[in-house]
């Protein structure tokens, strides 16, 4: 499953005003998904592609989400899943905001990889414990209802979405094999990550205007310490814990001068995404 997050914001802070980088969507929109998208093989054709602007009524209220099923999905075999959460600019603010995350590269990039996978992204209403519970509930809904390989469930969050997803993977580290933490601060705990061998990729511009890259380095150091405390060697930690903080020149060469939103380029390089997908449970 897939989870997306864009511009960040923390509790008690104003929302960032910079726009996110949003390449055109790659998946064809499919309306009114059929029940045959469930994991069981059926004699009826299974709809695939992009299912936009769905609503799931969960324990903490409605969850507005969209998802993508690869063309070969028919319920006969299980697929990896990415759950990705966008930033503040793409969260749920009512009907006018519905589907605003569908053009975001944090969602579409996973649908273009050679590895076919289910991709899920939600538009949540906050970036605290409620949103983390909703992300977990949505993840479990897809694991139980779709043909998902439970050993290859991944998470990603950008900015505000990263605040949510860092809580999510720490609350239920048993669910996720790896997590991409983009341009955000870490709001979750650390020990459960190491105790459950969750791989973490932290990416933030060194010149991030919103959070500041010191928060990325702090998260890395705390996670590294958690792995050390769990008995991991430095060599083994390097295989599951990764951080990148490109300098301003890296972004300027790409014509990017807004560094917080500019870190969305992490989704443009398949090597970054495939590092996440290289990990599995068990």
Regions found by a protein language model. Name each.
Residues 97-98, 212-229:
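Short alpha-helix in the alpha/beta-hydrolase fold that links the catalytic acid
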Residues 115, 194-200:
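Short, proline-enriched alpha-helix->beta-strand connector loops that line the catalytic pocket
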Residues 81, 85-136:
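Active-site machinery of serine-nucleophile hydrolases
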Residues 203, 207-209, 228-282:
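C-terminal catalytic histidine-bearing segment of alpha/beta-hydrolase fold enzymes
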Residues 9-79, 163, 168, 229-241:
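A domain-start/cap signature at the N-terminus of enzymes
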């Amino acid at each position: 499953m897939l989870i997306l997050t864009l511009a960040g914001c923390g509790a008690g802070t104003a929302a960032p005003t910079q726009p996110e980088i949003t390449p055109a969507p790659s998946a064809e929109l499919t309306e009114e998904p059929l029940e045959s998208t469930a994991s069981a093989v059926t004699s009826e054709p299974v709809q695939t592609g992009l299912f936009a602007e769905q609503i799931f009524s969960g324990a903490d209220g409605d969850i507005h989400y969209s998802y993508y099923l690869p063309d070969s999905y028919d319920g006969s075999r299980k697929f990896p899943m990415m759950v990705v959460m966008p930033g503040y600019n793409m969260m749920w603010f009512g009907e006018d905001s519905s589907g605003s995350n569908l053009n975001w590269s944090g969602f579409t990039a996973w649908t273009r990889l050679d590895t076919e996978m289910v991709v899920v992204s939600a538009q949540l209403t906050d970036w605290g414990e409620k949103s983390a519970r909703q992300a977990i509930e949505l993840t479990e809904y897809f694991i139980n209802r779709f043909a998902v390989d439970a050993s290859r469930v991944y998470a990603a969050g950008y900015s505000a979405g990263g605040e949510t997803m860092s809580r999510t993977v720490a609350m239920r580290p048993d669910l996720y094999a790896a997590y991409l933490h983009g341009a955000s601060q870490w709001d979750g705990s650390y020990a459960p990550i190491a105790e459950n061998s969750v791989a973490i990729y932290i990416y933030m511009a060194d010149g991030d205007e919103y959070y500041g890259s010191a928060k990325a380095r702090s998260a890395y150091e705390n996670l590294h310490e958690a792995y050390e405390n769990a008995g991991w060697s430095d060599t083994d930690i390097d295989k599951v814990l990764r951080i990148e903080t490109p300098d301003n020149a890296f972004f300027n060469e790409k014509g990017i001068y807004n560094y917080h939103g500019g870190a969305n380029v992490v989704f443009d390089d398949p090597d970054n995404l495939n590092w996440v997908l290289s990990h599995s449970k068990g």
